[in-house]
Amino acid sequence: MIKINLFMKNISDSIKLHFLTKLKIFSFKREKIVVLLGNKGVFLSTFLNNKLLDQLFIPTQGQIDLTPYKNFLSKFPKSDVYFLLDGSECKMRYDQIPILQSIVKIDPIEQFIEGYFNKEDIIAHCVYEITTKPSEIWSTLIMSCPFETPLSDIISCIIDKRSLDLKGIHFLTLELKVIINKIVQNIQNDKYNDYFQVCVYVSQTSGIKFIIKHKNNIITIRNLDYPFDKTTNYVQGIIEQEIHDFFILFKNYISNLDQRVCIILIVDDELKSLLESTNFEDRNVIFIPVDNILNKQTLEKERFIDANISRLFLEYKSFPAYNNNLKSIKKLVTIKDLTFKLYTTLLIVLLLIVCIIKYNTKQNYKDINSINEKYYATNQEYDSIKYKYPYIKNTTSLADLYVIEKLLETPVPLPFDLLERLIINLNPAFKLEEIKWELTNIDNILLISKRQLIIKLILKYHTNNLSIDESLKLLDDHMQNIKNKLSHLQIDYVIYKDKILDIFGKLVIPLSVNVVDYKT
């Protein structure tokens, strides 16, 4: 039994260890890696619970070297990986797609994409406006990117590492629309939602980025090289000049909006101090601290906000991209997730079975111990009976069994009738405090010897306005009267004179009475 128990314990411990290991690997709080691809390089960042764990910027080279990517990914082998595309290979296309609800049964945008784009291209879209008159038109922004190096090479590295999960590819342009909308909503109760919006920030992957939008429509995006060899004043001049150029370029557009313009500058403190003195034609200028975008307290306080953009993307990602290869990978990831869930379920069931077996085993041991304790108590009681009643010590014959049977069948006399007679004859001055009774000589029940029923009473005798001597005499007289009335009983009594209480003329005399009734 001990070997079986140890064997079951080893199985249980092994399953628990394996299950916890797998649970740690596939935990819902897995690390998340964002691969941000821009014109100037690739920025990799890893997050856990919205906190930045590590980051790496790899500048663009003529021929891609996968070693730094592999080294970075190897530090977080059990992670979910997201790609965020922002390079010059990402193309924007605006289309007005008519919707014929009565004729078209499939997704009209998907049908449009299949007709105008390469199946291998990575594509995502956003419907930013829907008009219904004179007919229903979907104004759509479609982002596309060829599936080529360095994206294809990095994805190959991820697929080779089976512990990494490719969760999706997104275009930064579409995700910035969501992030900027969130920023605008947080400013004076969405006051600038209908304004012409110019958003500026600085990143390592794209340099100085300018996003021009109105409502949900990304009008244009422009990236300028960041002048690392120049002063911050030079950077301030670039931003100021470029914004003025946008005002000239979109003069008619701005006029149609009644000159309502909002400039959102996501910059560090140094750039902010310089840009605050800049005259943007009295336009509304909103400065957003780089480390407090959307009131997120876990952001990095750096001029280049690649890590912060990646962090915000993880929270607000909305437009996944796809192509044929990605659909296949998605299916494989789904199958992997389902397989893990099935595997986890089987592990849980097996663990429950082992726990139930272990619980039942413990219960069996508990029941066995209880039976052993009862058996031991019975043996002790049997030994006590043999010691108290020596004539049944060796009960081996029918005669001995007959004696035991008769002993058990013999009725035990009760003291209630005798007590009733005693109490009736007691004077009301007596107060009953305690009663004890016992039956003696029961071991000789089947022999000639007599049994004795002994009753022990503790009484208190109360008198008023009498001396102690007078009270004792009355007590003796009353007890003698009881003995005369119950002459067939042996009645003895003892008065505790040293415990007599005298309370303002009221005497309380304690006494004990022994009554013996002989039973044949």
Curated annotation (Swiss-Prot):
It comes from the Bacteria. The chain crosses the membrane at residues 337-357. Keywords: Membrane, Transmembrane, Transmembrane helix. It is found in: Membrane. It is a single-pass membrane protein. One of its GO terms (cellular component) is membrane. This is Uncharacterized protein RP855. It comes from Rickettsia prowazekii (strain Madrid E).
